[in-house]
Regions:
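Subset of outer-membrane beta-barrel
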Residues: 24-405
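Bacterial Sec-dependent N-terminal signal peptides
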Residues: 1-27, 275
């Protein structure tokens, strides 16, 4: 598919800000920080390369995008790499395909994702994980302000990641992930028709994660409580033109409780909380930093990380509004058939994404397949509205079982 865009819009895209405009932000007075009704202006948090936050896992995608503390599989590196050290299998891999903007009739934008891990160590479990994320924005025809054709391009972004995780005790594991990020949105194009060219963005980042796992005896068997936490995408800012934008630094905390119902049936309840660790735009902050940018945008990544818990112009109440909630449930029959459902909530002032998710999982011999479907519940349109996505998984235990048979 060929998309013709006004060059000004492409320039805006090259800034790669993950911004959603809410009704309260319209008509905001920068001198008072109030909207026409006297309410504090909602500040949608802005980051570059938002593709890093796209959930690539169809299993998690069917459970409202929870993933920090659910039982580990090959896609754990996206949520919480420390879970690899607690995986029951020594080896696993996955392939995921996520179509993008299908509800708008776009058919050449997609996210492809591959991940895998290998567990080693007899007395102390350790694991190495790897992943590759590729986001294609399709084919674009560049035009200038006068709609004159300048050529064609294929914007794309990718991320490679390597993780190491280690079990510190029977109940606790930690992990770290190193990443390289590349973003080519409009490389070589000039936003003003002059000599200034848009460059490709490059960045390095790290994740740190931990998982606590505790068995709890019940009448029907032993249940498993998992609690996890992860700080993700801590790295340098990414630059396309003169200014630099923050990576989507994020703090996530999650819990999941897997409960056996009988010999063949089990159910898991999970909850995740996520908050971006970057500055909240403040229309009342007119200070200019050393690089000529607004002071809130001119902070270092580390300063932004620690300051993000108290920089919202609306105070503590607005900080709480920046927390996204995900809740999900997963039912398994005989560890071969799964039914999943979930809900995702984001405050209206911070984007307004709200949706239900449903999905199925099937496992047979060496292969498992997960499907998920997203049903929006708010007026805020999303790129995954009414979209079916799927993941394929392979694990070492399945290979061993097949050989034994």
């Amino acid at each position: 598919m060929k998309k013709t865009l006004i060059f000004l819009l492409v320039t805006g895209l090259s800034l790669a800000t993950n911004t959603f405009v809410s009704a309260q932000q319209k008509g905001c007075d920068p001198t008072t920080g109030k909207d026409p009704l006297g309410r504090d202006c909602g500040g949608a948090v802005q980051t570059a390369v938002p593709f890093l936050m796209i959930n690539p896992d169809a299993r998690s995608g069917a459970m409202g995008d929870v993933g920090i503390a659910i039982s580990p599989d090959a896609n754990a590196i996206h949520f919480n790499a420390s879970k690899y050290a607690m995986a029951p299998q020594k080896f696993g891999m996955s392939l995921t395909y996520t179509p993008w903007l299908r509800s708008l009739g776009v058919n050449d934008i997609y996210l492809a994702y591959a991940a895998g891990y290998y567990q080693f160590g007899s007395t102390v479990k350790q694991a190495i994980g790897v992943s590759l994320r590729y986001f294609s924005l399709g084919s674009i025809q560049w035009t200038d302000y006068n709609a004159s054709v300048l050529g064609e391009g294929s914007p794309r972004e990718f991320e490679t990641a390597v993780s190491y995780s280690r079990q510190l005790s029977k109940f606790l594991a930690v992990g770290a992930t190193a990443k390289f990020i590349y973003s080519n949105l409009a490389t070589g194009q000039s936003p003003d028709g002059g000599s200034t060219k848009i460059s490709s963005g490059r960045a390095g980042a790290v994740d740190f994660s931990m998982t606590y796992k505790r068995p709890i005896k019940m009448a029907a068997g032993t249940s498993t409580l998992m609690i996890g936490g992860a700080v993700k995408n801590i790295g340098n800012k990414i630059t396309y033109l003169r200014s630099a934008d923050f990576l989507p630094q994020n703090l996530g905390i999650g819990a999941a409780w897997e409960i056996p119902l009988d010999q063949y049936n089990s159910i898991t309840f999970a909850l995740d909380l996520n908050k971006l660790l970057v500055p909240t735009p403040n229309p009342r902050d007119t200070a200019i930093g050393a690089n000529g940018l607004p002071a809130w945008k001119d902070k270092s990544p580390v300063s932004a990380l620690f300051g993000s818990f108290g920089d919202a112009p609306g105070g503590g109440q607005e900080e709480l509004k920046e927390i996204n909630f995900s809740a999900g449930v997963e039912y398994w029959y005989d560890k071969q058939f799964a039914v999943r459902a979930g809900y995702f909530y984001e405050n209206a002032e911070k984007g307004g994404r709200r949706y239900f998710t449903v999905g199925l999982g099937l496992k047979y011999n060496v292969m498992g397949i997960n499907l998920s479907y997203l049903v929006p519940t708010s007026s805020q349109r999303g790129p995954l509205d009414n979209t079916l996505r799927f993941s394929l998984l392979f694990d070492a235990a399945s290979f061993k079982d097949t050989e034994d048979n």
